[in-house]
Design a protein with these regions (language model features):
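Active-site-proximal loop/turn and secondary-structure-junction residues that shape catalytic pockets
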Residues: 44-48, 68-70, 97-98, 145, ...
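Glycine-rich, acidic/polar active-site loops that bind/position phosphate-bearing ligands
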Residues: 120-305, 314-317, 324-562
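Flexible inter-domain linker/hinge segments
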Residues: 1, 6-15, 168, 172-175
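Histidine-centered active-site/metal-ligand motif
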Residues: 43, 63-66, 261-263, 319-321
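Short linear, low-complexity motifs centered on an aromatic residue
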Residues: 73-90, 104-107, 112, 206, ...
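Active-site core of metal-dependent hydrolases
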Residues: 7-119
Length: 694
């Protein structure tokens, strides 16, 4: 490996490269544009494009692409070469117009009715706050994507809008709190990414993995995660080689990959980066997922990002670590040396409490997918109920501050290891609560409900917007206040009285919490379609309209896309199951019966006195499972044939209420048959082979 500081960002047109290569006036103007949010002028764009092209050509680049994030949840790109005819030859050109604007076909991406097939024009626009980078001899330019009529058709545009809204209201709030030196507040995120690695040759033998990204059949292996021996265990050499190359490729492209380790389930791993500005973190996470999958193939493996690729062991999520940082370098979620008397810090915590409580449904919607429904509430991931963990010490501090009591910082004691040579460790104010969906972890909030394959843009868009709304209210009160400290304490009191129900420090997996949450009036949206229905509620439409995030039409379109994607995912899985049963699993069951019959006949040929009881019992069981499979497969095929052609919502409800139960029953019969069949007859790799094959 080369020198890491030299390697890091070597394929990124970052601030260092810009400062070195751009004319001084152009560089200064670009920085001013990025800081102020002003539009990029054509003359500045032309200079930047020319310098960017020269830098890219120095790295062997031949093409460029506007890299955007449509509402498919994955990235999209179209490669154009720098080639331009010049007489009998060609020259390499890249104009400012090509840098700042592209025109992909908007009708071919999900639009929820915003674009029809005959309304194809869409635009991509350069996001100058997220630096361009090089991959596969191509210059990747991060862009936003909108329709011909200006509606957002991507995940980046609303995210950037929400960051602007949060900055505006947070600066107002801080000014009202006496922070005169702050001119900008930026949300930052670090997204922990979980994934599975399995052998490529086994993946190729599983139709369910190839078509859907997860297994739809499979009996549990004798050993799963019961011994807790995989979590933080020794990383296998093949996986370590993969992680090493992944780190290097991410570092080259400016993604600050920091930590990697084995996760709880066999074959499960995690990568965590440093925090960075939210839109850059979102771009970085999309790039991370793409490189994870590509490099795994190079190492003879396949990276699975599905939320629940294997039944019976933990699924994969993505923890969204969110905080707010001022342009003066202060983390607003860091209480400093005296958090008990840091009123700005305490009011920031109250703002997040209020935002999460008032907009529970919106946060739940951002993590609602067909895949994530298999995780949430399954005693391996947070429940589908939103709650916040602060820890008893911090919760008590908030209560004391609200009451105006003389708060003192809690004394943090040293841990007694009872080994003289060991260093003294200071204990944190509170323990960690891994069952909480939204936990305060010292200087950030960790939103743990995201699915592993999801973009982090949606949850951060909602979180930024909801917190902006609350900070705006606080600013209104504080700006009219004659006694700031008294107003702060009143706001803290009101928050605890009106939104204290969202705080929960106990076991989120327990049945008692389900009952308690219901008593508190918290939402428990168990399935994705239940959540989607709340998106266009009046208060949510009003929130997004007020802060310029979504129009009513944009919000309705997203609701349609949510329903449509959910139904399509389940429909594809159901069709895959039917095909696998017809063409693989039932034939295996018939072959097992055939072998038993041959064994029985062979016994009788040896001696009529030999017992065939084992063959009879096994044959009866296998025949029963075969009958169940045929009946279940026929039912599923009929349900697929009768799939409604009505609204997207009705399709999603049909998929949830009719297809999923039939799919679950079909799987039970197939998994039982797998355990009855001889290994050489089973037509696909087993869980044991997949999970322990690397």
């Amino acid at each position: 490996m080369s020198n890491i500081p030299e390697l890091f960002g070597s394929l990124v047109f970052n601030d260092t490269v810009q400062q070195k290569r751009l004319p001084h006036d152009t560089y200064r103007r670009l920085r001013q544009i990025v800081a102020s949010g002003e539009p990029l002028t054509p003359d500045v764009a032309d200079v930047i494009a020319n310098v960017m092209k020269a830098w890219a050509l120095d790295h062997g680049v031949t093409h460029f692409t506007h890299w955007f994030q449509p509402m498919t949840g994955i990235t999209a790109e179209k490669h154009d070469s720098f080639l331009t005819p010049a007489g009998d030859g060609v020259i390499m050109e890249f104009s400012g117009r090509e840098l700042i604007k592209g025109e992909p076909d908007a009708s071919s991406f999900p639009s929820g009715g915003l674009r029809a097939t005959f309304e194809a024009r869409g635009y991509t626009a350069w996001d100058p706050t997220s630096p361009a980078f090089i991959k596969d001899d191509c210059l990747y330019i991060p862009t936003a994507f909108c329709s011909y009529t200006g509606e957002a058709l991507d995940k980046k545009t609303p995210l950037l809008r929400s960051m602007h809204a949060l900055n505006r209201e947070a600066v107002r709030f801080l000014r009202a709190m006496g922070w005169a030196d702050v001119t900008a507040v930026t949300p930052t995120v670090g997204a922990e990414q979980e994934y599975f690695l399995i052998p490529k040759e086994l993946y190729e033998q599983r139709r369910d993995l190839r078509y859907t990204g997860r297994t739809l059949f499979g009996a549990m292996a004798p050993k799963g995660q019961e011994l807790d021996d995989h979590y933080f265990g020794t990383i296998k050499p093949r996986v370590m080689a993969y992680m090493k190359e992944l780190d290097e490729e991410l570092w080259r492209r400016g993604v600050m990959a920091k930590t990697e380790h084995n996760e709880v389930a066999p074959a499960q791993h995690e990568l965590a980066p440093f925090f960075t500005t939210t839109n850059i973190a979102a771009d970085g996470n999309q790039l991370t997922m793409e490189l994870m999958q590509r490099l795994a193939q190079k190492h003879g493996m396949v990276c699975l990002l599905a939320e629940k690729p294997f039944a019976g062991v933990n699924g994969s999520g993505k923890h969204n670590n969110w905080s707010l940082v001022t342009d003066t370098g202060r983390n607003l979620l860091d209480g400093g040396s005296d958090p008990a008397n840091n009123l700005t810090y305490l009011l920031m915590l109250a703002a997040v409490m209020t935002a999460v409580d008032e907009y529970q449904a919106l946060l739940r919607i951002t993590v609602a997918t067909a895949g994530n429904d298999h995780r949430l509430g399954a005693s391996e991931a947070p429940p589908a109920i939103l709650s916040i963990f602060l820890g008893e010490a911090l919760q008590n501090t908030l209560m004391q501050a609200a009451c105006g009591e003389g708060s003192t910082a809690a004394t943090r004691r040293e841990l007694e290891m009872r080994v003289p040579v060991m260093p003294h460790l200071r204990q944190d104010d509170s323990d960690r609560n891994r069952t909480s969906p939204f936990a305060f972890t010292g200087n950030k909030f960790e939103f743990r409900m995201l699915g592993s394959s999801q973009s982090i843009s949606d949850p951060n868009t909602v979180l930024n917007t909801a917190v902006a709304e609350v900070l705006g209210r606080y600013a209104d009160r504080l700006e009219q206040s004659a006694d700031r400290e008294d107003t702060v304490r009143t706001l803290l009191q009101e928050t605890l009285e009106q939104h204290g129900r969202i705080l929960f420090n106990g076991d989120g997996y327990s049945e008692e919490w389900q009952q308690e949450a219901e008593r508190r009036g918290l939402l428990n949206l168990r399935t994705a379609p239940e959540a989607f229905a709340h998106l266009t509620e009046e208060k949510n439409v009003a929130l997004f309209a007020k802060h310029g995030i979504f129009t009513a039409a944009e919000l309705t379109s997203r609701q349609e896309i949510h329903y449509e994607t959910y139904a399509k995912c389940i429909r594809i899985e159901a069709a895959t199951m039917a095909e696998m049963v017809r063409r693989q699993i039932l034939p295996a069951g018939q072959a097992a019966l055939r072998e038993l019959g041959q064994t029985s006949r062979a016994k009788q040929e040896i001696s009529p006195l030999l017992s065939c009881k084992a063959e009879e019992l096994l044959g009866t069981q296998i025949a029963n499972y075969n009958d169940m499979l045929l009946a279940g497969c026929t039912l599923l095929e009929n349900l697929l044939r009768d799939f409604p052609s009505s609204t997207e919502e009705q399709k999603a409800l049909y998929a949830r209420d009719r297809l999923l139960p039939a799919m679950n029953e079909l799987r039970q019969a197939a998994d039982a048959l797998e355990q009855m069949c001889a290994a050489h007859l089973w037509p696909m790799p087993t869980y044991g082979e997949l999970l322990y094959g690397v």
